């Protein structure tokens, strides 16, 4: 359905009659959700909530993306089956999405019967349409692990600049691209063995077929984002250029995924069954809710279908996915909305700086998830522009907009209304010009949200909040309250303020649903919808006692968040990097389009292989005696240790073991420290080493930290060999 066709359908349809299926990209099930992921899920959730508030039938669908070589290797490293790993990660992802108010109607898994059946059905239909081809290809093969290696699981010496430890397809030092066969001294990231060349039969989706090209040239005209349209036209090229390449949709055993029908030992490549997972998750919901699944996904369906994705996976969602659907007997997406990447303080997220922030660490630090929802929304628009989380600006904007402007309105008026007027508004005040102005602005704000221009919606909302605060400042209810003769004016001022606050809460509801829920309870009203702009507060319904809605962001919370994430992602960082070399929304797979997001994490992969005795000898491990220990003010995780390591003076070390030990428990104990670690300047002081502690790979399932204690007889300063 083109954009023009969609507009005519929407114009002809009465409000509330639209049927809309919405998806976000599927997070890969080998790592934690971080704030970079959350940009997309918050963006999608705001849009979904906006549509629901219009009364439309909207289903927001998600799932974990669970197949592929990285999952298989990660599970092996952790001593788990792939199923055990993906079940654990699913629970963690679901927890994080719930924490941030991401309102999936169904959050499922691509490792499901529904997905297997649908993937097989689509494959068979494509094959019957002559769009599946088989070809012999030569690949790198690990003779130790007995598996074919994707490009990024091979490293070696760049053939151009001779930089060491470069990937099988490109050099991060000189920027050259090449074939894996061009690498000098190649080795397998998985085992360290030298790869050999081996041929195998692979299955290809014939995207180069003229039918696919013709369809895609027509379909691209309906995309809402000019950047997406331009990129697709670049990929398609001019008519007759034949720029589209066939797509390898199979992988060889061993592989965690679905076996291809009629092809023993061959499995669907993860990028084939992953988008089918959208439909599988929706089908699972339909079966539970009694919804007619086929009516939503058949060709010509009047229901709308939208995909929110990161711009790094536009290729899959605007070429392969629509073509797969078109030629397998399904409807095609109404539109695909791509967003940019997230930077923090103007730079890529960094573990060393603590800006690679996980969703769980944000919650554990005590930060309000609706602060982040608001901040992201204030930056987001309908383009693919990258957005930046500036932590100073985050604190200033939340404190100014949400506390200083918005929440302040209710806190200034509620007490007077309850104390002086039994909590009942003045009905005549509901027609005040200021109230009328806010009421008339709601349609415009809602339209900005639906157009994905969230920054415009919030800018307009905060401009109105400024006007309300100016009105309160001018009316001075605190002065009016001093003289009983001003009772009518005081009543009007408080009533206008609270009705304005209700309308501002309506405008903010898609962004801050939990605050809106608290406001609804405060006013004793039903859940707010856009149509409720015309339904003012009434004297017939007294307000309830005002409960504080939001606190200010404290700089100490930001510092604690950075400290918690500095050098973290322990299990999911090290293991996932070794297993996949990738993080990012639905992009951590053995696929080149994921490479941009994968490089930073993948660079750690080589460090997890075997090391030589010379490498180990570089680490100076010493026996240390804890002569003093104290908690670190302002930190939930750190203890400050004073250590005797047999030198003339003691060492000062900060250690993240506060959750496991009281300071007095450690004084006098012997432990082991890394004595030659470079001193590190921290907010709380200089840390001059590292104390060793043990923990389970899955600290959620098996919590606990245990410092190492040598046998009696060991003395401070002794070297551990």
Swiss-Prot record:
Cofactor requirement: Zn(2+)
Compartment(s) of residence: Cytoplasm
GO BP, sorted A to Z: methionyl-tRNA aminoacylation
Superkingdom to which the source organism belongs: Bacteria
Pfam families found in the cross-reference section: Anticodon_1, tRNA-synt_1g, tRNA_bind
Domain called tRNA-binding: residue spans: 615-721
Binding residue positions for ATP: 351
Entry note: cofactor: Binds 1 zinc ion per subunit.
Protein's UniProt keywords contain Transmembrane: no
Cellular component aspect of the GO annotation: cytosol
Matching NCBIfam families: metG (TIGR00398), metG_C_term (TIGR00399), PRK00133.1 (NF001100)
Annotated motif 'KMSKS' region, positions: 348-352
Gene3D superfamilies linked to this entry: HUPs, Isoleucyl-tRNA Synthetase, Domain 1, Methionyl-tRNA synthetase, Zn-domain, Nucleic acid-binding proteins
Name of this protein: Methionine--tRNA ligase
Residues annotated as binding Zn(2+): 158, 161, 171, 174
